[in-house]
């Protein structure tokens, strides 16, 4: 597949660590009420813009001066959807191969963000474009649109193309920035089990690994309901943060042993892990039939897309 660089208002080509989640992302909003202490959006030069404590629809949609005159009398959300449709049509064949990731700059299932997210997801599915949603909001599925109460026909129309991911750190104490949005890690695993029962592809982002024991416990508890894991280390920490190389080795071997009981489960070890192990004997442990590439490869393999 020839790479296409997308630089739209909604869709864009991801870079660096973000690309390991998917080559194409969609960001309607920036900011997040969780204010997790480890969030990469809260660090660096872009923190005042991306790290705000509430979700904000991007200026390119909200400010009239940024819109063509014929679109200035409609809502910002409606205009955002028009732009999304136009950009997706322009890159349709490519996005059918890469899928679309929601979202790198906010949680797409917040009260404020999920209505527009779902308009976009449903449109993408109509166009046979796979999408994946990464969230910490387990309760959104129950509170909005009676998600688990919908008839099976509704879910069958989405199952092949929509995958749900949940961030699992095992450290609720670092994620309680906004009580009205907060879902404990245990609540997220419960939502994973319900979505799995409905036939969806379900995955977990074990990133960042804040401490090895907590992360492994999240993997162990979620394994019956999870199709895929993406595991990455915490950025910006001091060398030796995870202790000796032998501790990281044991973590990898424990993961290998745990997933062996679930042969259809796959794992992607992010570059942060592979870089930590480069040049050591331990990187041999990352060679395993259930350890695969990043992006949407696990969904495409599973669904035959």
Predicted regions and their residues:
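C-terminal accessory extensions appended to soluble enzyme cores
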Residues: 244-305
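Conserved AdoMet/S-adenosylmethionine-binding subsite of the radical SAM
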Residues: 79-259
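N-terminal [4Fe-4S]-dependent radical SAM core
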Residues: 1-79, 83-99
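Feature targets compositionally biased, intrinsically disordered low-complexity regions
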Residues: 7, 15, 98, 156, ...
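Residue-level detector of family-conserved "landmark" positions at structurally sensitive sites
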Residues: 49, 134, 205, 269-270
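Residues in flexible loops and secondary-structure boundaries
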Residues: 32-34, 47, 110, 217, ...
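Intrinsically disordered, low-complexity regions
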Residues: 1-3, 8, 57-58, 68-71, ...
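General N-terminal targeting signals
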Residues: 43-45, 49, 55-56, 117-119, ...
